[in-house]
UniProtKB/Swiss-Prot annotation:
Disruption phenotype: Mutant loses the ability to grow with fumarate as a terminal electron acceptor and to reduce iron(III), manganese(IV) and nitrate. It cannot grow with DMSO as the sole electron acceptor and utilize nitrite. Deletion of the gene also severely suppresses selenite reduction. It retains the ability to grow with O(2) or TMAO as electron acceptors. Insertion mutant shows a greatly reduced ability to degrade the xenobiotic compound RDX in comparison with the wild-type strain.
Cofactor(s) recorded in Swiss-Prot or TrEMBL: heme c
Topological domain spans for side Cytoplasmic: 1-12
Keywords recorded for this protein, A-Z: Cell inner membrane, Cell membrane, Electron transport, Heme, Iron, Membrane, Metal-binding, Translocase, Transmembrane, Transmembrane helix, Transport
Name of the protein in question: Tetraheme c-type cytochrome CymA
Enzymatic reactions: a quinol + 2 Fe(III)-[cytochrome c](out) = a quinone + 2 Fe(II)-[cytochrome c](out) + 2 H(+)(out)
Applied biotechnology uses: CymA plays an important role in the anaerobic degradation of the xenobiotic compound hexahydro-1,3,5-trinitro-1,3,5-triazine (RDX), a cyclic nitramine explosive commonly used for military applications that is responsible for severe soil and groundwater contamination. Therefore, supplementary data on the specific electron transfer mechanisms occurring in Shewanella that increase the rate and extent of RDX ring-cleavage products is suitable to develop better remediation strategy for RDX contaminated soils and groundwater.
Binding site for heme c 2: 75, 78-79, 182
Biological source species: Shewanella oneidensis (strain ATCC 700550 / JCM 31522 / CIP 106686 / LMG 19005 / NCIMB 14063 / MR-1)
Coiled coil segments of this chain: none
BP GO terms, sorted: anaerobic respiration; denitrification pathway
Length: 187
C-alpha cells in the first residue's frame, strides 16, 4: 500500500468534501454502535439464549426481583459494566457466548446450567471481586455512607467497619452476599 497517498491532497475531491464524508461516516457508525449495544443489552435479548433454564426465575424470586423498594434489576445491571469503555470491552469479550450457544450441544438447557453452575458462578465472583463489586455499588451507592434508615443496625455496623479497612483487606459485596440473585452452588 502506498502510505504517502493517504497524506496527499486529493486532486478529485476537496478537503471539505472529504471532511464532511468522514464526519457523516463517523456519526452513522457511532449511532449504529450505540443502537446495537442498546439492543443487545435488554433482558429480552439475554433470554433469547438463556431461555430454557431457571436464570430469570431465580432473579425474580430474589430480593433483586422486585423487593420492598419495588425495583427489579435487569440482566445488564449486574452482568455488564456501567462505564462506556469497560461496557464495550465486556460486550466484545462476552460475544464468545454466542459461539457457545451455537456450538455447545445443550448450552441452552437446565441440565447444562446445573452441570456448569459452579464454574460459571466462580467466574462471576472473580469478575465482581476484580472490580470491587462495581456493579453492586452502582445501585447501592449509599452502602458505606449515609445508609438508608431501613438498613438494620448490625448491617450498618458491618458495612461501616468494613469500609474503615484498607482497600487491600476490605471485603467486597460478593464476599458476604454471593448468591443474592442466582443461588450459589454448594460444594
Amino acid at each position: 500500500m502506498n502510505w504517502r497517498a493517504l497524506f496527499k491532497p486529493s486532486a478529485k475531491y476537496s478537503i471539505l468534501a472529504l471532511l464532511v464524508v468522514g464526519i457523516v461516516i463517523g456519526v452513522v457508525g457511532y449511532f449504529a454502535t450505540q443502537q446495537t449495544l442498546h439492543a443487545t443489552s435488554t433482558d429480552a435479548f439475554c433470554m433469547s439464549c438463556h431461555s430454557n433454564h431457571s436464570l430469570k426465575n431465580e432473579v425474580l424470586a430474589s430480593a433483586h426481583g422486585g423487593g420492598k423498594a419495588g425495583v427489579t434489576v435487569q440482566c445488564q445491571d449486574c452482568h455488564l459494566p456501567h462505564g462506556p469503555v469497560d461496557y464495550l470491552i465486556k460486550k466484545i469479550i462476552v460475544s464468545k457466548d454466542l459461539y457457545g450457544f451455537l456450538t455447545i450441544d445443550g448450552f441452552n438447557t437446565q441440565a447444562w446450567l446445573d452441570e456448569n453452575r459452579k464454574e460459571q458462578a466462580d467466574k462471576a465472583l472473580a469478575y465482581f471481586r476484580g472490580n470491587d463489586s462495581a456493579n453492586c455499588q452502582h445501585c447501592h451507592t449509599r452502602i458505606y455512607e449515609n445508609q438508608p434508615e431501613t438498613m438494620k443496625p448490625m448491617a450498618v455496623r458491618m458495612h461501616t467497619n468494613n469500609f474503615k479497612k484498607d482497600p487491600e483487606t476490605r471485603k467486597t459485596c460478593v464476599d458476604c452476599h454471593k448468591g443474592v440473585a442466582h443461588p450459589y452452588p454448594k460444594g
